[in-house]
């Protein structure tokens, strides 16, 4: 197996390096002190088309793969921005992969182009305070209504929820005790992060203040039926299409930070 970068991947590194050179130590120190989202940096990445690196061309993406996205994220993380720069965008790189894989053509066209164009930001609503890594034990509940679903529950350690317009939300549609396995009965939605029904509370951290971490209290959030991805009850299988790339990209980011150190 050849582990050398291709010419195209080296071009990705060089292009990212050019962008990151405009955002040095002073920029990231200021963001980490005042806690403001790095919007200027985010829009520079949008302008270069980098949020669509791993998405199909038919929705405005570049049609490249996760290996290419890893090259990009490693280059970002090896800059002055380190994990702050990487985590400001990586949800928008890996999170919607479940939409690209399992969404209808209408959903893909409705949801993916605004992310790639920087018109909408999204959050990843999976982790809960009482389930941790045991996703099958999450308790956020989506109940059917005449027009779709209504959701009650709680999520924690949700990045960028202060600025997100949308949320990729995993919720239980069938009680766990009625399922053969805990991972059954979960459904995946991509919907508005509506503050009228979602109380988003930022969690203070020792670092990476420019990328907010949050607890979200969800009280009767209405979700249209058209915002359900795929089949009801198959959400855990779908979310793996986002979670697996996330782990790979975070590994690449760690390598980038280590190389720069």
Regions found by a protein language model. Give the residues of each.
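Amphipathic, small/basic residue-rich leader segments at the start of a protein or domain
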Residues: 1-87, 106-110, 114-117
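Glycine-rich beta->alpha junctions and the first turn(s) of the following alpha-helix
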Residues: 2-8, 74, 78, 198-261
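Short Ser/Thr-interspersed hydrophobic loop/turn segments at strand-loop and sheet-helix junctions
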Residues: 49, 72-77, 171-173, 191-196, ...
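N-terminal glycine-rich flavin-associated loop
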Residues: 84-106, 132
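A short, Trp-centered hydrophobic/proline-enriched beta-strand micro-motif
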Residues: 118-126, 170
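Glycine-rich phosphate/pyrophosphate-binding beta-alpha loops
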Residues: 132, 156-162, 245-249
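A structural signal for short hydrophobic beta-strand segments in well-ordered beta-sheet cores
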Residues: 140-143
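A short core secondary-structure module
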Residues: 148, 152-201
């Amino acid at each position: 197996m050849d582990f050398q970068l291709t010419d195209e991947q080296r071009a990705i590194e060089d292009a990212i390096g050019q962008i990151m050179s405009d955002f040095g130590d002073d920029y990231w120190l200021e963001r980490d002190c005042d806690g403001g989202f790095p919007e200027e940096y985010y829009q520079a990445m949008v302008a270069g088309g980098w949020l669509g690196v791993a998405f199909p061309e038919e929705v405005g993406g570049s049609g490249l793969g996760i290996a290419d996205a890893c090259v990009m994220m490693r280059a970002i993380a090896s800059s002055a921005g380190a994990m702050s720069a990487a985590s400001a965008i990586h949800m928008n790189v890996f999170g919607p992969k479940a939409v690209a894989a399992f969404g209808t053509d209408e959903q893909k066209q409705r949801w993916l182009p605004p992310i790639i164009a920087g018109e909408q930001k999204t959050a990843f609503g999976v982790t809960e305070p009482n389930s941790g890594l045991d996703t099958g034990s999450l308790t956020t509940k989506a109940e059917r209504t005449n027009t779709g679903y209504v959701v009650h529950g709680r999520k924690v350690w949700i990045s960028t929820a202060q600025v997100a317009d949308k949320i990729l939300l995993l919720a239980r549609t069938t009680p766990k005790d009625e399922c053969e396995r805990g991972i059954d009965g979960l459904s995946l939605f991509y919907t508005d992060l509506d503050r009228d029904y979602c109380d988003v509370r930022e969690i203070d951290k020792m670092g990476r203040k420019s990328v907010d971490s949050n607890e979200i209290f969800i009280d009767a959030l209405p979700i249209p039926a058209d915002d359900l991805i795929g089949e009801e009850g198959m959400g855990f299988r779908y979310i793996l299409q986002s979670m697996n790339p996330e782990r790979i990209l975070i590994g690449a980011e760690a390598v980038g930070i280590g190389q720069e150190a």
